[in-house]
A protein has these predicted regions:
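Long, small/polar-residue-biased beta-strand-and-loop interaction regions
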Residues: 1-146
Length: 146
């Protein structure tokens, strides 16, 4: 198991949906009892002032500038390249993301939300990681995403 840790406008969150201007310091903690690899998927959407999803507005993500230790996969999925011991936390995923404010189809203000979904898989055996996630693991490091 794993938990996402992130900041939004310098406030720290570990779960839930939050709106704001800048999302930063996205990290994942291995909360399981075995060494594990982790990956995250970013999902963008728009909400109104009450936090309700706004329909009819195409979702998109801000530009993601990865930091060290992460590899980009398909479908806005990112892989931490090394297995983590229980209790360890990944390095920060990316540079801070600036979230947009827009206008809904009805003219109301809408706010961009980026949700971070994390997934962990037991690190041993490496072949299981490769088969389940379609990655290449070399000497304990994810070196390629297929």
């Amino acid at each position: 198991t794993c938990t996402v840790h992130e900041q939004l406008n310098d406030d720290t969150f570990t779960a839930g949906t939050h709106t704001g201007d800048v999302k930063s310091n996205i990290r994942v903690e291995n909360t399981g009892t075995y060494p594990a690899y982790v990956r995250v998927r970013l999902v963008g959407r728009w909400v109104n002032g009450a936090g309700e999803t706004v329909g009819g507005v195409p979702s998109r993500l801000p530009a993601v500038k990865l930091l060290g230790g992460w590899l980009a996969g398909s479908g806005d999925t990112y892989y931490y390249t090394t297995a983590m011991a229980p209790g360890d936390m990944t390095g920060v995923l990316c540079e801070p993301m600036v979230l947009e404010t827009g206008t809904g189809l009805d003219g109301s203000t809408s706010y961009q939300v980026v949700e971070v979904f994390a997934e962990a898989i037991q690190a041993a055996p490496e072949e299981a990681v490769s088969a389940a996630w379609g990655v290449t693991v070399t000497d304990g490091v994810i070196t390629a995403v297929q």
